[in-house]
Regions:
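Short amphipathic
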Residues: 1-8
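Amphipathic alpha-helical interaction surfaces in cytosolic regulatory modules
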Residues: 9-46, 50-98
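Short, Lys/Arg-rich amphipathic alpha-helical interaction segments
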Residues: 95-112
């Protein structure tokens, strides 16, 4: 089992959606950390635990771009099967993120 603690491994102050909007964006997190750990977990047939606690909160745009964006890059069912979220501080984030993953896949289909 692999783990990313966003606060420890990325930042305590997550930013907006895109790199062009400033530091610590969802896009930066996905491209620089999440994607690589996700692919490593898939190759090892392991879960990737995402620990959300410890920071100063998340913009919805950060979460959608990071996790919804991953589901636009890779099959939605594989993303859902591989990622597991932990949030004792704000448990509702887990459902919110799973919804972004599910709906990101639908948006991808509509673009074609």
């Amino acid at each position: 089992m692999m783990t990313i603690n966003i606060c420890r491994d990325f930042t305590e102050t997550p930013g907006a959606r895109y790199k062009s909007e400033g530091e610590f964006s969802g896009e930066e997190f996905r491209d620089d950390l999440l994607k690589h750990k996700y692919l490593e977990a898939r190759a090892r047939n392991e879960k990737l635990i995402i620990e959300l606690d410890g920071g100063y909160g998340y913009a919805t745009s950060f979460l959608e771009e990071a996790f919804g964006g991953l589901a636009r890059m890779y099959p939605q069912n594989e993303v859902l099967d591989t990622l597991s979220f932990v949030s004792n501080d704000e448990p509702s984030l887990i459902k919110e993120i799973n919804e972004y993953i599910i709906h990101a896949n639908d948006k991808k289909k509509r673009k074609h």
